């Protein structure tokens, strides 16, 4: 008799994806972040669902409903902080996951990579709208500044912004629709993640060498299930340390002040995970130019397969490319730091140099380094 997990229509799908899946024998801990992202998404959906039971998306009561969750709802404070810091963990895993893809050339799986970039945009949109919901000062002004960027689009810009706002400023209509979108998008993300996995399982996983591993596969269970469980335990350890010891470490104190359209905070800035893109936006003195650079800073990932000039897939055996990759990481950390600083000397020039460096590294230096390596290896 066939095992039920191999014959049952539903169990068969789970079996082929998580149990009998042939996986390369040499994938490192950098391959753990996919499963961690899945866990993050589940945590966010569950905590978000419980928050939505007590939250009201009205400008008059939104701020006090969040206060009510923290003070009066049973374990409301832990649910709220798990959701807020869960977003930070989500983005840490996302950046690691994308970085792994860049380093080991995983972007050569075109469909998987493109769905991944769409997922990245969707998660960023969800996080942005979620930040608006508590209706604190930074929520309101962040929403005002970021939505206003669309007014840089020629001809239709102003109409588009007012259409998104549902009025002539960020107000009740904006908050209600942001809540609606923030609620529905995670389920769309979950569906996209399924498609992401579907395409991945068509080709099988990449591995650190970038060489085909068809002749050396091992079953996903028990080897990688146990490895993923270790990753999940470490993720929960870090998340709960944040939540229970320093829940406001990554937040902005301004968001504990209720939104006031008549009073602008001295430094408007988004959450830490958007600071690198915000720094690129601010480094260009022209509004439309800044918006284009902001979009391109993420959209550039789509073009990675076209910019791959090396005869090797992975960077494992390419010291020049490795060096440039880590310079890119340092550059992104610099941009993140600059994004949180006020617009004054010397931060302006540092931000501009780091922004130029970001695009130069990806568009020019890394493809050239790959060609140099090809020549050095006489390929």
Swiss-Prot record:
Binding site for heme b b566: 97, 196
Taxonomy, superkingdom: Eukaryota
Presence of keyword Signal: no
One GO BP annotation of this record: mitochondrial electron transport, ubiquinol to cytochrome c
GO MF, one annotated term: metal ion binding
Coiled-coil ranges from the UniProt annotation: none
Cofactor: heme b
Residues holding a ubiquinone: 201
Binding site for heme b b562: 83, 182
Keywords: Electron transport, Heme, Iron, Membrane, Metal-binding, Mitochondrion, Mitochondrion inner membrane, Respiratory chain, Transmembrane, Transmembrane helix, Transport, Ubiquinone
Membrane topology: Multi-pass membrane protein
Keyword Electron transport: yes
PROSITE patterns: CYTB_CTER (PS51003), CYTB_NTER (PS51002)
Main localization, broad class: mitochondrion
Co-factor: note: Binds 2 heme b groups non-covalently.
Transmembrane segments: 33-53, 77-98, 113-133, 178-198, 226-246, 288-308, 320-340, 347-367
Record-level GO cellular component terms: mitochondrial inner membrane; respiratory chain complex III
Location(s), subcellular: Mitochondrion inner membrane
Miscellaneous comment in the UniProt entry for this protein: Heme 1 (or BL or b562) is low-potential and absorbs at about 562 nm, and heme 2 (or BH or b566) is high-potential and absorbs at about 566 nm.
Family of this protein: Belongs to the cytochrome b family.
Function in brief: Component of the ubiquinol-cytochrome c reductase complex (complex III or cytochrome b-c1 complex) that is part of the mitochondrial respiratory chain. The b-c1 complex mediates electron transfer from ubiquinol to cytochrome c. Contributes to the generation of a proton gradient across the mitochondrial membrane that is then used for ATP synthesis.
The protein's assembly and partners: The cytochrome bc1 complex contains 11 subunits: 3 respiratory subunits (MT-CYB, CYC1 and UQCRFS1), 2 core proteins (UQCRC1 and UQCRC2) and 6 low-molecular weight proteins (UQCRH/QCR6, UQCRB/QCR7, UQCRQ/QCR8, UQCR10/QCR9, UQCR11/QCR10 and a cleavage product of UQCRFS1). This cytochrome bc1 complex then forms a dimer.
Descriptive protein name: Cytochrome b
Source organism (scientific name): Moschus fuscus
Record lineage: Eukaryota, Metazoa, Chordata, Craniata, Vertebrata
């Amino acid at each position: 008799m066939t095992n039920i997990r191999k014959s049952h229509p539903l169990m068969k799908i789970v079996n082929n994806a998580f149990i009998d899946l042939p996986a390369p024998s040499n994938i490192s801990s950098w391959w753990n972040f996919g499963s961690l992202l899945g866990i993050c998404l589940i945590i966010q959906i569950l905590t978000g669902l419980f928050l939505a039971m007590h939250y009201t998306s009205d400008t008059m009561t939104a701020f006090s409903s969040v206060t009510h969750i923290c003070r009066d709802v049973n374990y409301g404070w832990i649910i709220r902080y798990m959701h807020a810091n869960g977003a930070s963990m989500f983005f840490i895993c996302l950046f690691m996951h994308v970085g792994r893809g860049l380093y080991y050339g995983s972007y050569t799986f075109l469909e998987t990579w493109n769905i991944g970039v769409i997922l990245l945009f969707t998660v960023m949109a969800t996080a942005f709208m979620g930040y608006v919901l508590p209706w604190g000062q930074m929520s309101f002004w962040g929403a005002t500044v970021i939505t206003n960027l669309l007014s840089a689009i020629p001809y239709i810009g102003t109409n588009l912004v007012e259409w998104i706002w549902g009025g002539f400023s960020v107000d009740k209509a904006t908050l209600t629709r942001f809540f609606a979108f923030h609620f529905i998008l995670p389920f769309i993300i979950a569906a996209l993640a399924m498609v992401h996995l579907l395409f991945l399982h068509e080709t099988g996983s990449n591995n650190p060498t970038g060489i085909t591993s068809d002749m050396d596969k091992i079953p996903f269970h028990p080897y990688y299930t146990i490895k993923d469980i270790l990753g999940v335990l470490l993720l929960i350890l870090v998340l709960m340390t944040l939540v229970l010891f320093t829940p406001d470490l990554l937040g902005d104190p301004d968001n504990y002040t209720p939104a006031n359209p008549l009073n602008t905070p001295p430094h408007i800035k988004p959450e830490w995970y958007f600071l690198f893109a915000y720094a690129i936006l601010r480094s260009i003195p022209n509004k439309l130019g800044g918006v284009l650079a902001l979009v391109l800073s993420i959209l550039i990932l789509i073009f990675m397969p076209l910019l791959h000039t090396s005869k090797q897939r992975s960077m494992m055996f390419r010291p020049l490319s490795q060096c440039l990759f880590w310079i890119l990481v340092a550059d992104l950390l610099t941009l993140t730091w600059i994004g949180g600083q006020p617009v004054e000397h010397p931060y302006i020039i540092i931000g501009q140099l780091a922004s130029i460096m970001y695009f130069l590294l990806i568009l020019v230096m890394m493809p050239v380094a790959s060609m140099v390596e090809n020549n050095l290896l006489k390929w």
